[in-house]
């Protein structure tokens, strides 16, 4: 790739589509992905943040509009779809969550729909929004799938982890939660260091696996679309991109469902009284 960022080879094309639109928090200037080194702690992927916020607001506005205009008569298509999603999530929470909190069902609904919407950005033509961003707004780079950004998925997983700690302390108390970490699986004071290591690893592995699983699947899916577009001539891309897009619909739905299910299960485990 040239210094100006001009795309000349398939390798440049693939690398260009893997660059984020980044903001340097120290200078509040956009980072040029073609002339700088690796991202630092002080860089913010504002494209991922922007699309995740926009999709979250879209979810809230649509569901609020449907709730405000819902009727007891024959529902429209949008109301029917929303009711099916709510019913599906509610049944999942009833089956998997055994606590008493009334927050879990709305949380599960938010997680499922939000992650699903972010995943669905992967079905857009790979060059559509980046082309608009570059030629209309002059952006040096743009990625549109928030869940293909590990900082987004781990941030969501961190939120779940905080809720796990909150419900564990709420249901068991500080002493009970501490005892759970230090006296399991070996109930003897001499094994407290071993128990703390084992339980600490088990506790930390939940948000890590939750975030990395979603990121890994969505990053791989996005990369396959980029490879198809970057390595094949335009007239033959549809032969692979269309079947992969159809199969990818299953993947993005399944990943949203898995993220929701694991969130419910982890919070159910945290809400159990011992």
UniProtKB/Swiss-Prot annotation:
Location (main, coarse): membrane
Residues that span the membrane, as ranges: 43-63, 103-123, 149-169, 223-243, 245-265
Give the record's keywords alphabetically.
ATP synthesis, Cell inner membrane, Cell membrane, CF(0), Hydrogen ion transport, Ion transport, Membrane, Transmembrane, Transmembrane helix, Transport
The record ties this protein, via InterPro entries, to:
ATP_syn_F0_a_bact/chloroplast, ATP_synth_F0_asu, ATP_synth_F0_asu_AS, F0_ATP_A_sf
Membrane topology of this protein:
Multi-pass membrane protein
- Tell me the superkingdom of the source: Bacteria
What SUPFAM superfamilies would the database entry show?
A: F1F0 ATP synthase subunit A
Q: Name one Pfam family in it.
A: ATP-synt_A
Q: Where in the cell is it found?
A: Cell inner membrane
Q: Does the keyword Magnesium apply?
A: no
Q: Which Gene3D superfamilies match?
A: ATP synthase, F0 complex, subunit A
- This protein's record includes keyword Disulfide bond: no
Tell me, in a sentence or two, what this protein's role is: Key component of the proton channel; it plays a direct role in the translocation of protons across the membrane.
The family annotation for this protein states: Belongs to the ATPase A chain family.
The name of this protein is: ATP synthase subunit a
């Amino acid at each position: 790739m040239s210094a100006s960022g001009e795309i000349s080879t398939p390798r440049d094309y693939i690398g260009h589509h893997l660059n984020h639109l980044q903001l340097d928090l120290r200078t509040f200037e956009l980072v040029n992905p073609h002339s700088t080194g690796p991202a630092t702690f002080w860089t913010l992927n504002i494209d991922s943040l922007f699309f995740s916020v926009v999709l979250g607001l879209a979810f809230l506005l649509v569901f609020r509009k449907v709730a405000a205009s819902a009727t007891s008569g024959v529902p429209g298509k949008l109301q029917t779809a929303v009711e099916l999603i709510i019913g599906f999530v509610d049944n999942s929470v009833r089956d998997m969550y055994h606590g008493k909190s009334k927050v879990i069902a709305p949380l599960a609904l938010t997680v499922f729909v939000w992650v699903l919407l972010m995943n669905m950005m992967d079905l857009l033509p790979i060059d559509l929004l980046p082309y608009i961003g570059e030629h209309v707004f002059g952006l040096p780079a743009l990625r549109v799938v928030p869940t293909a950004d590990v900082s987004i998925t781990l941030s969501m997983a961190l939120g779940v982890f905080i809720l796990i700690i909150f419900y564990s302390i709420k249901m068991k108390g500080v002493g009970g939660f501490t005892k759970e970490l230090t006296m399991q699986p070996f109930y003897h004071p001499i094994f407290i260091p071993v128990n703390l290591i084992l339980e600490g690893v088990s506790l930390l592995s939940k948000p890590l696996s939750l975030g990395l699983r979603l990121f890994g699947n969505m990053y791989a899916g996005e990369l396959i679309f980029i490879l198809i577009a970057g390595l094949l001539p335009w007239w033959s891309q549809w032969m692979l991109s269309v079947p992969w897009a159809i199969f990818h619909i299953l993947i993005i739905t399944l990943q949203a469902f898995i993220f929701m299910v694991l969130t419910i299960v982890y919070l159910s485990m945290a809400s159990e009284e011992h």
